[in-house]
C-alpha cells in the first residue's frame, strides 16, 4: 500500500457512480482538509482525515504531501499529438494576416502536416509522439485522447494509429485512440470529395476495425471541410464497426454538426466556438458532452465558446487542449483551465471540473479517472503548498506540481 500523508486539501472528491457534472453541479468541488489518501496497487483504496490515517506497515511507501493539495490528474479529451515536424511558418503567416482558411487553401494546414507525416518513418513518429506525451505528463495530464487525421491515405492513417497503439502500450498515461480520417480531403482527392468519403467509409474504417486500432471515429464537420450528410454517413459507417462517434463542429461556422452529433449519441462534440441557442437546446438531455478548446481560440484569435451560457442552461462542459501543430501547439491543461476562467468566465471550480471529471467523460474514462473516488485509478497531482484551488488558474505560470502519480506510481 502507498499512503499520501499531510495533504493540505484533497480536492475533487466525487461519489462513486457520478460520471459527469452538469449545470449547478459544475460549481461543486468535494474536498477534505488535512487529509490522507491510500493506494492499493493502481487504485485509490481510501482517504480521510489525517488524524485517522492508518499506521504504515514495513512494506508501505509513504509520500508526504507536506501541506500541498492532491487533485486528480488532468484528462485531455481532444489532442492531435501524433504528428511530424512543426509548422512555425504558418505561425508567421497568421501574424502577417492570413486566416486559417486561407492557409488551408494554399495547401498548408492539415495537408502540410499530412505531407510531413508521409515522409516520416513510423519509428520517428513514435519518438516524437512519446516526447509530447512525456511533456504532458510532466504538466499534470494523466489521460490523453489521441487522434489520427494527418495521414489522409489508408496507409498513413494506419501508420498513425499503429504508432498510437505503441504509445498506449508504452506510456504510463491512459491513451485513447480516435480515427479521424475525415479531418480533411486527402491531397490526391482534390475536387473529388465524394470519392474520398467513399475511401473513408469503405476502406479506411474496415481496415482500422480489423486491426482494432481505434475506439472512436471523428469527423471535422465544418464549413469548407465535411458536410452534415457526409458526417452522418461516416459516423454510421464507423458505428457499424463498433466505433463510438465524436465530432469536430462549429469552429468556423454553425455547421449542423452539433445536431448530427446528438443524432448519433456522440460521446462528445468539440470546438463550439460558434454556436447559437439552437445548439444548446439540441444538447439538452443528451449523452453528448460539449467540449471547448480555448487553446485554439487563444492561438488563432477566434471567438471562445459560450461556456458560461452552456452551464447556465444546465449543461456540462469539458475543456481540452486541442494540442496540434497548427492551431494549438500546447498540451498544458493548467493553461487551458486558466483560459477557461480568464476568457470564458468560468469559475475555478467550473474550469476544474471541465478539465477533470467532464473531460474524462468526454474520452470515455470517467469510470476510472477524473476524480478522487475509491476504486478509481490513482492518477494524481501532488501540488506544492498553494493557498487554494483558484491559485492554479490565477498564477498559471507559477510552477505548482510537486509530484505526478499515474496508476499509483510516482512518475515525475
Where are these regions (language model features)?
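Conserved beta-strand scaffold positions in the cores of enzyme catalytic domains, especially
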Residues: 3, 60-64, 177, 404
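Non-catalytic positions within long, well-ordered alpha-helices that form the structural scaffold/packing
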Residues: 137, 201, 209-210, 239, ...
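Active-site-adjacent C-terminal substructures of enzyme catalytic domains
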Residues: 244, 254-371, 383-387, 396, ...
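Metal-coordinating catalytic core of metallo-dependent amide/deamination hydrolases
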Residues: 111-128, 134, 142-255
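N-terminal metal-binding scaffold of metallo-dependent hydrolase/deaminase domains
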Residues: 1-56
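Divalent metal-coordination and catalytic microenvironments
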Residues: 7, 37, 42, 67, ...
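Metal-associated gating/positioning segment near the N- to mid-region
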Residues: 61, 65-128
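C-terminal cap of metal-dependent C-N hydrolases
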Residues: 21-26, 357, 377-412
Amino acid at each position: 500500500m502507498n499512503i499520501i500523508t499531510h495533504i493540505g486539501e484533497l480536492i475533487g472528491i466525487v461519489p462513486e457512480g457520478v460520471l459527469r457534472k452538469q449545470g449547478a453541479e459544475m460549481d461543486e468541488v468535494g474536498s477534505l482538509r488535512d487529509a490522507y489518501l491510500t493506494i492499493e496497487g493502481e487504485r485509490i483504496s481510501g482517504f480521510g482525515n489525517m488524524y485517522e490515517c492508518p499506521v504504515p506497515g514495513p512494506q508501505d511507501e509513504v509520500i508526504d504531501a507536506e501541506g500541498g493539495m492532491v487533485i486528480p490528474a488532468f484528462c485531455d479529451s481532444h489532442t492531435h499529438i501524433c504528428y511530424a515536424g512543426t509548422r512555425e511558418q504558418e505561425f508567421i503567416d497568421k501574424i502577417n494576416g492570413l486566416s486559417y482558411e486561407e492557409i488551408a487553401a494554399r495547401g498548408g494546414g492539415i495537408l502540410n502536416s499530412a505531407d510531413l507525416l508521409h515522409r516520416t518513418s513510423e519509428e520517428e513518429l513514435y519518438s516524437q509522439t512519446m516526447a509530447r506525451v512525456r511533456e504532458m505528463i510532466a504538466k499534470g495530464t494523466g489521460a490523453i485522447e489521441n487522434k489520427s487525421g494527418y495521414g489522409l491515405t489508408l496507409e498513413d492513417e494506419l501508420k498513425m494509429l499503429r504508432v498510437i497503439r505503441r504509445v498506449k502500450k508504452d506510456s504510463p498515461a491512459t491513451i485513447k485512440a480516435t480515427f479521424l480520417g475525415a479531418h480533411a480531403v486527402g491531397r490526391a482527392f482534390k475536387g473529388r470529395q465524394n470519392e474520398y468519403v467513399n475511401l473513408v467509409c469503405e476502406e479506411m474504417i474496415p481496415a482500422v476495425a480489423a486491426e482494432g486500432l481505434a475506439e472512436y471515429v471523428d469527423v471535422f464537420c465544418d464549413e469548407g471541410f465535411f458536410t452534415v450528410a457526409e458526417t452522418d454517413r461516416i459516423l454510421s459507417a464507423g458505428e457499424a464497426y463498433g466505433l463510438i462517434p465524436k465530432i469536430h463542429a462549429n469552429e468556423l461556422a454553425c455547421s449542423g454538426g452539433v445536431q448530427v452529433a446528438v443524432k448519433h449519441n456522440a460521446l462528445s462534440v468539440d470546438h463550439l466556438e460558434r454556436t447559437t441557442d439552437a445548439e444548446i437546446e439540441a444538447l439538452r438531455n443528451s449523452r453528448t458532452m460539449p467540449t471547448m478548446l480555448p487553446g485554439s481560440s487563444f492561438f488563432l484569435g477566434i471567438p471562445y465558446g459560450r461556456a458560461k451560457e452552456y452551464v447556465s442552461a444546465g449543461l456540462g462542459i469539458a475543456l481540452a487542449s486541442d494540442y496540434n501543430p497548427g492551431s494549438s501547439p500546447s498540451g498544458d491543461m493548467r493553461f487551458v483551465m486558466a483560459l477557461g476562467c480568464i476568457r470564458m468566465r468560468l469559475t475555478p471550480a467550473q474550469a476544474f471540473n471541465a478539465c477533470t471529471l467532464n473531460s474524462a467523460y468526454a474520452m470515455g474514462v470517467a469510470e476510472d479517472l477524473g476524480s478522487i473516488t475509491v476504486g478509481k485509478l490513482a492518477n494524481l497531482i501532488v501540488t506544492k503548498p498553494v493557498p487554494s484551488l483558484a491559485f492554479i488558474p490565477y498564477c498559471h505560470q507559477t510552477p505548482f506540481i510537486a509530484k505526478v502519480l499515474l496508476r499509483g506510481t510516482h512518475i515525475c
